[in-house]
């Protein structure tokens, strides 16, 4: 019977990563963030264990969206005369969160992984005490 060696100390370490979304495309950023949240970039990745990192995203309002496909959100669903508003101009952080959530793997971890994601529209964030690592080379 084969037994997999699992180093317990490596699974408990969670790094804080900082990603600047200024002048970056939505899909490219979402792929990088989903890989960081699930921990697939680590050498000791295992799908049964939670080995992902915390991710802080800044400048979400300055992302580049696909302008050819306007995205709308229904404000009052199921009623005649419902209001449609463009999601791109109103809620850039919500659009990023939806894209990342769709790229996460299916299963019970899909609900817990977005809890480690912090999205801010401006350049300021309250997580300076965690010393996040700025990731520019992955994007």
Swiss-Prot record:
Highest taxon of source: Eukaryota
Any one GO MF annotation of this record: structural constituent of ribosome
Compartments it resides in: Plastid, Chloroplast
This protein's name: Large ribosomal subunit protein uL13c
Subunit structure: Part of the 50S ribosomal subunit.
Keyword field contains RNA-binding: no
Family, similarity comment: Belongs to the universal ribosomal protein uL13 family.
Single GO BP term: negative regulation of translation
GO cellular component, one term: mitochondrial large ribosomal subunit
Gene3D superfamilies: Ribosomal protein L13 (3.90.1180.10)
Biological source species: Trieres chinensis
Signal peptide (UniProt feature, chain positions): none
Keyword Plastid set for record: yes
């Amino acid at each position: 019977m084969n037994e997999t060696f699992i180093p317990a100390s490596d699974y408990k370490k969670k790094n804080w990563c900082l990603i600047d979304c200024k002048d970056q495309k939505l899909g490219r950023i979402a792929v990088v963030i989903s890989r960081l949240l699930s921990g697939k970039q680590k050498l000791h990745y295992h799908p049964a264990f939670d080995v992902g990192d915390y991710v802080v995203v800044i400048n979400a309002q300055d992302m580049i969206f696909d302008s050819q496909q306007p995205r709308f959100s229904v404000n009052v669903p199921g009623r005649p005369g419902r209001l449609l508003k463009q999601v791109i101009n109103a809620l850039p952080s919500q659009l990023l969160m939806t894209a990342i959530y769709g790229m996460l793997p299916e299963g019970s971890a899909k609900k817990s992984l977005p809890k480690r994601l912090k999205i801010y529209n401006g350049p300021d964030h309250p997580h300076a005490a965690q010393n996040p690592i700025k990731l520019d080379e992955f994007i």
